[in-house]
Amino acid sequence: MHKTASQRLFPGPSYQNIKSIMEDSTILSDWTNSNKQKMKYDFSCELYRMSTYSTFPAGVPVSERSLARAGFYYTGVNDKVKCFCCGLMLDNWKLGDSPIQKHKQLYPSCSFIQNLVSASLGSTSKNTSPMRNSFAHSLSPTLEHSSLFSGSYSSLSPNPLNSRAVEDISSSRTNPYSYAMSTEEARFLTYHMWPLTFLSPSELARAGFYYIGPGDRVACFACGGKLSNWEPKDDAMSEHRRHFPNCPFLENSLETLRFSISNLSMQTHAARMRTFMYWPSSVPVQPEQLASAGFYYVGRNDDVKCFCCDGGLRCWESGDDPWVEHAKWFPRCEFLIRMKGQEFVDEIQGRYPHLLEQLLSTSDTTGEENADPPIIHFGPGESSSEDAVMMNTPVVKSALEMGFNRDLVKQTVQSKILTTGENYKTVNDIVSALLNAEDEKREEEKEKQAEEMASDDLSLIRKNRMALFQQLTCVLPILDNLLKANVINKQEHDIIKQKTQIPLQARELIDTILVKGNAAANIFKNCLKEIDSTLYKNLFVDKNMKYIPTEDVSGLSLEEQLRRLQEERTCKVCMDKEVSVVFIPCGHLVVCQECAPSLRKCPICRGIIKGTVRTFLS
């Protein structure tokens, strides 16, 4: 990356030659597709300004090249052009007009036109490659372009490695420190129009830079140094140190490791905002809030995902804070930690100390697994006292007096407390939530009734899933019959067969049957009747199977519990990748990251998925 003057002139080739070259480039292709993207480029570069004239009216008596050279880019409206530096807009061009002279006459204080004229008089205009520009001018935290070129280009040394001019200009200024941009979060929020995909705003903000525009121009909040024309392999912190080694921010900061990003195309605020074009207007959380917290819309219902940790959330409610939800469910997200700080994450996690344990404890519950999806309950010893407190507020009592089912009220209040950390404050809020919960519950019951009518066998298998894990021993014959009937493929067959222990084979087989549905359940029933009549009778005739826990894993660390779950299972949808996503609220861990977004209901308990938590193991 070299430090060069921002003025770039291209004498020599005719405009038609330049235009034909540009039309073959990605830059002009992007411009032609959408004039709205014009601010994607650094218009301090004459070549970029030239690219905007591809749709300039043919009858205008002033050449596009002379307009571009005078600092103007085309706005896309009639013959109106605009200066990239001072913002002057001109139109109604007439024969004999000189863009440079008109620019100088109407806006003599424009720093670009001043330097262009002085450079022309001094015959100092030279071709330069579009390398990184570094300036050490004073800057306030604004996106107004008129303040971007307050210094003299001629003061910069032609030697790209000589930083003397930068140091001299910097030392002559008053204090450039910007208190408004002193936090990483504040700097990050300035990048909503950031044009580059290969350099993330989070990295730039961490290196002390905030976005000022146009193009990819950024400035340091501490020393005021400016950089632009970033290249794919540039490191923001290294470039900062190289050009502004005496910056107080660099002297007082410790460079930390970069963090990995799950979806590179969504790392800018602007990119995430674009995904919310069809965001449902009924959702009470605004796209701006979600995008700022790292989330982008996946195009279904109100489902969003974090570009960094890939965590997914849905079913947003009035009063939800995306940052709080981010910290609650995905506390290891590095973007979250960078933006909000570890103290914020710890404070949110402190409100829900047993959240992950609760998810794990519900992932393999006993009893009727075809019943309503379990609500995440308080930890042992907390339930009775906290239940009494939360159910005795005036607002909750009012809801009970209206005739709402007590269990439904209790579940709704618990969900509210787990989501926001507080109970309902108004009767209107809780009544609205209860009405929605009733509608959702009725819909679930209808769907479950339809499923049970279609196949009572599948419901019995789901209900006795844990017991079947223990008691099913004739796995391979059933597996072969499923393959023969083309219910599963050879890969799915072999994955289950390769498990070294029968209980693991049984676990994989039962969960696969639940995912495959009625056809698999019928084959399972027929095979079991022939091979294991006792188990068949207990399951399908007497309907009286018992599950007896054989190992207490509660004493194991959460990480070890998760590790065991992952080692035991492959994704029940693709039967290829390892499971890595825990469903909320049921807590089942049965699918991989790629398959989870396509599911509305958990394939094991058929409960509606209201969120996902991706498991990260070191």
Curated annotation (Swiss-Prot):
Sequence ranges of the BIR repeats: 46-113, 184-250, 269-336
GO CC terms of this entry: CD40 receptor complex; cytoplasm; cytoplasmic side of plasma membrane; cytosol; nucleus; XY body
Cross-referenced CDD domains: BIR, CARD_BIRC2_BIRC3, RING-HC_BIRC2_3_7, UBA_BIRC2_3
EC number: 2.3.2.27
Any Gene Ontology biological process: regulation of reactive oxygen species metabolic process
Chain positions recorded as Zn(2+) binding sites: C306, C309, H326, C333
Post-translational changes noted in the entry: Auto-ubiquitinated and degraded by the proteasome in apoptotic cells. Upon stimulation of death receptors, including TNFRSF10B, recruited to receptors and cleaved by caspases. Proteolytic fragments remain associated with the receptors. This cleavage presumably inactivates the protein.
GO molecular function per UniProt: cysteine-type endopeptidase inhibitor activity involved in apoptotic process; FBXO family protein binding; identical protein binding; protein-containing complex binding; protein-folding chaperone binding; transcription coactivator activity; transferase activity; ubiquitin binding
Domain CARD: 453-543
Chemical reaction(s) catalysed: S-ubiquitinyl-[E2 ubiquitin-conjugating enzyme]-L-cysteine + [acceptor protein]-L-lysine = [E2 ubiquitin-conjugating enzyme]-L-cysteine + N(6)-ubiquitinyl-[acceptor protein]-L-lysine
Top enzyme category: transferase
Tissue: Present in many fetal and adult tissues. Mainly expressed in adult skeletal muscle, thymus, testis, ovary, and pancreas, low or absent in brain and peripheral blood leukocytes.
Summary of activators and inhibitors of this protein: The CARD domain inhibits the activation of E3 ubiquitin ligase activity by preventing RING domain dimerization and E2 ubiquitin donor binding and activation. The CARD domain-mediated autoinhibition of the E3 ubiquitin-protein ligase activity suppresses cell proliferation and migration. USP19 regulates the stability of BIRC2/c-IAP1 by preventing its ubiquitination.
ZnF bounds (RING-type): 571-606
Superkingdom per UniProt: Eukaryota
Keywords assigned: Activator, Apoptosis, Cytoplasm, Metal-binding, Nucleus, Repeat, Transcription, Transcription regulation, Transferase, Ubl conjugation, Ubl conjugation pathway, Zinc, Zinc-finger
Subcellular location(s) per record: Cytoplasm; Nucleus
The protein's role, per its UniProt record: Multi-functional protein which regulates not only caspases and apoptosis, but also modulates inflammatory signaling and immunity, mitogenic kinase signaling, and cell proliferation, as well as cell invasion and metastasis. Acts as an E3 ubiquitin-protein ligase regulating NF-kappa-B signaling and regulates both canonical and non-canonical NF-kappa-B signaling by acting in opposite directions: acts as a positive regulator of the canonical pathway and suppresses constitutive activation of non-canonical NF-kappa-B signaling.
Subunit composition and interactions: Interacts with DIABLO/SMAC and with PRSS25; these interactions inhibit apoptotic suppressor activity. Interacts with CASP9. Interacts (via BIR domains) with TRAF2; the interaction is required for IKBKE ubiquitination. Interacts with E2F1, RIPK1, RIPK2, RIPK3, RIPK4, BIRC5/survivin and USP19. HSP90AB1. Interacts with UBXN1. Interacts with GSK3B. Interacts with several death receptors, inclusing FAS, TNFRSF10A and TNFRSF10B. Recruited to TNFRSF10B in the absence of receptor stimulation. When TNFRSF10B is stimulated, further recruited to the receptor and cleaved by caspases.
Family of this protein: Belongs to the IAP family.
Free-text note on domains in this protein's UniProt record: The BIR domains mediate nuclear localization.
Protein name: Baculoviral IAP repeat-containing protein 2
Organism: Homo sapiens (Human)
